[in-house]
């Protein structure tokens, strides 16, 4: 794992000397968060077969991770100054352990619902603890370190995808869940007995924040965030079910997409220095639409090429939207950013069961038309992707309008928005 070397740097006054160790712990905890996304995506079919639950029910199970995340993020953000990052990190550890153990010993649908909620809550707790902690530990290079921290979300998805792809058959889904206990225990060891930084956050004017939430630009982005999250997660979280019969390895597709996202975000500044945030969002929506269309029409090796286009589309969605709000509606403050990230994750609580229903209906229709086995699965997967394409297509229109509206306003370079420290406050900023 790469951690920015600071051995020759002077640690600022008031910052604990063990900040490198805490930063490493934060990165490992984010890897656990990402692995839960990747491995869950890889075992959905097996969970359905093991517990005899439908695609709609699998959608509800999936949605619990996206519900637990914003709940923890909002609660953690509200109590951070009172309890500090140490207690939030231990809350994340306990929730991760509970979620993983309860998943292994789940007896059916409701067991999976409860265990997946705990995992989502743990993931949100990691974000609530680590982002402000890193800001407090590295006041001299906040952007740089937050950027490197959040690379480990797509990086962790690559790790989880490869583990599931190469070891899933031999270990089974329970074995894959147990593997995630290894990095979970590692980050607990790294934080045990350590001194944590004191919060140096300035208390914002909450009344002004609430007024900022009524800004038309903020409300516009609030609506768009639900669609950008759906564009990304509706495909990546259902990749195994949708692309399983396409002739490509679904988890390798997920690893490819996540690897490109990590690389793209790591080098975000030089790549898109000349573009403004609205332009980045518009181009991203166009590429995402093309990518999902290609995924719904291609098979075999062409799926990997289609995945590259899709990855380029979703790469900058989330962090650029958070950066846009930070730059153009600053009055909304940290509250606005927290709610924006929360609605992005919460939207998948709504959409996951819907997508499961689409997949189930398409499979039934294909079977009724005479298709069987892999052929029926392929037809159903393609039809489901063709329904999902409406998410980014709507964004093409919305972000196109935003681009022309913003042309006559003072612009902020896209790299400033993408790499803004405040824009890194959710995992979406690195997903």
Model-derived features with residue positions:
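Helix-breaking motifs and short loop linkers at transmembrane-helix boundaries and internal kinks
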Residues: 52, 84, 105-110, 139, ...
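Cytoplasmic helix-loop-helix junction between adjacent transmembrane helices
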Residues: 115-151
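Extracytoplasmic gate region of multi-pass secondary transporters
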Residues: 40-41, 214-263, 349-356
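Residue-level signature of mid-helix packing/kink "hotspots" within the transmembrane helices
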Residues: 38, 66-74, 158, 258-266, ...
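Conserved MFS/SLC helix-loop-helix module at the cytosolic interface between two early adjacent transmembrane helices
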Residues: 71-110
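Symmetry-related core transmembrane helices of the 12-TM Major Facilitator Superfamily/SLC fold
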Residues: 174-192, 382-404
């Amino acid at each position: 794992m790469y951690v920015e070397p600071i051995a020759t740097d002077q640690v600022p006054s008031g910052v604990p000397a063990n900040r490198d160790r805490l930063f490493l712990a934060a990165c490992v905890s984010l890897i656990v968060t990402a692995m839960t996304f990747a491995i869950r995506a890889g075992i959905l079919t097996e969970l359905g077969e093991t517990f005899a639950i439908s695609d709609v029910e699998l959608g509800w199970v999936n949605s619990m991770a996206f519900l637990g995340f914003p709940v923890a993020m909002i609660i953690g953000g509200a109590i951070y100054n009172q309890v500090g990052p140490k207690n939030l990190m231990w809350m994340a550890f306990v929730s991760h352990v509970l979620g993983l153990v309860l998943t292994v010993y789940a007896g059916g649908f409701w067991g999976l619902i409860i265990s997946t909620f705990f995992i989502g809550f743990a993931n949100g707790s990691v974000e609530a603890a680590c982002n402000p902690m890193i800001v407090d530990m590295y006041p001299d290079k906040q952007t740089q370190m937050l950027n490197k921290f959040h690379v480990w979300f797509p990086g962790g998805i690559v790790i989880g995808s490869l583990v599931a792809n190469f070891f899933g058959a031999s270990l089974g889904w329970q074995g894959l869940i147990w593997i995630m206990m290894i990095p979970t225990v590692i980050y607990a060891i790294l934080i045990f007995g350590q001194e944590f930084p004191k919060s140096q956050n300035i208390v914002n004017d909450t009344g002004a924040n609430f007024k900022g939430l009524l800004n038309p630009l903020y409300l516009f982005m609030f609506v768009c965030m639900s669609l950008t999250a759906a564009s990304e997660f509706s495909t990546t979280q259902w990749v195994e079910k949708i692309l399983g019969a396409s002739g490509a390895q679904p988890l390798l597709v997920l690893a490819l997409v996540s690897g490109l996202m990590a690389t793209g975000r790591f080098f975000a500044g030089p790549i898109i220095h000349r573009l403004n945030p609205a332009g980045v969002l518009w181009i991203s929506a166009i590429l995402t639409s093309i990518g999902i269309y290609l995924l719904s029409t291609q098979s075999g090796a062409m799926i990997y090429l289609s995945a590259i286009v899709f990855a380029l589309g979703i790469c900058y969605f989330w962090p650029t939207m958070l950066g846009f709000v930070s730059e153009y509606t600053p009055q909304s403050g940290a509250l606005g950013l927290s709610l924006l990230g929360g609605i992005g994750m919460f939207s998948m609580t709504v959409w996951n069961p819907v997508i499961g229903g689409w997949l189930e209906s398409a499979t039934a229709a294909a079977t009724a038309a005479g298709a069987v086995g892999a052929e029926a699965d392929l037809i159903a997967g393609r039809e489901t992707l063709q329904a999902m394409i409406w998410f980014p297509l709507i964004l093409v229109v919305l972000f196109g309008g935003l681009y022309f509206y913003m042309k006559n306003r003072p612009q902020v370079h896209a790299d400033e928005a993408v790499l803004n420290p405040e824009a890194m406050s959710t995992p979406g900023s690195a997903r």
